[in-house]
Amino acid sequence: MKKILIYLSFISFILCSCASLQTNPPKDFSYVEIKTDDYVLATWQKIKDENSLVKIYVEGDGHAYNSKGYPTKDPTPKSHFLRDIAFNDTSENVVYLARPCQYIKSDEYDNVDWTTGRYSYKILNNMAQAIKKIAGDKNVILIGYSGGALLCGLIINHYQEELKIIRWITIAGLLNHTRWTKYFGYIPLKYSLDLDTIPNIPQTHYVGEKDTIIPCWLTLQCVDERNCVVIENAAHDKGFNIKDIVNN
């Protein structure tokens, strides 16, 4: 068995409770709405150097289902976990990219877009459009959280050359929804594409040892363990060392 790198110590800035969440973005981030073919997508952007690459943080699936298992009317995330990571990234060009229908309400949106069709070609294409509008011809590093990890993988497989994606980072990432729904007995995502082929680009996958939402072994089944960093005692949205991620 290949050696898995386990981080045993945490330095400085650890996100361990909701009390540490930022309610307001830093002054150097601006809220920008991006219009694509089918959606208006919410972003928070810090662009300081037109000649540098862009790091784009792609949100997870958000609040897709309520506690009774029914689709919600608003999939906006309840947690600011990924936003906080993006806001603490000191790189010159950093963007937090929400998923379709998050933060922006519309009667025209269909809950299929954040439930069984959350990784459909329609979603994939619109997210790729947004990334292109954000980055233009700049190189891109995609950082996907939870279900956003799978979406990033699909985008890389379909649009890597067009979008100049040079690296893929995942945090508590879902990399195969078929295995995930089967394991938990969830409704299959029948209108979604799956990540049947892992992108062949430089990549790092941060997984929480105690993640009960997306167990780390599910991620380790999908990718080379040499590209995985198992964070001891980390859960799905707690215990990750932000500095390790943003400085990757």
Language-model regions, residue ranges each:
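Short, surface-exposed "cap/lid" segments of acyl-processing enzymes
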Residues: 36-42, 46-98, 103-104
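Gly/Ala-rich beta-loop-alpha elbow adjacent to hydrolase catalytic centers
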Residues: 143-152
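Conserved hydrolase catalytic core segment
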Residues: 154-166
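The feature captures the conserved acid-bearing segment of alpha/beta-hydrolase catalytic domains
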Residues: 173, 178-238
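Post-His helix in hydrolase/transferase enzymes
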Residues: 239-248
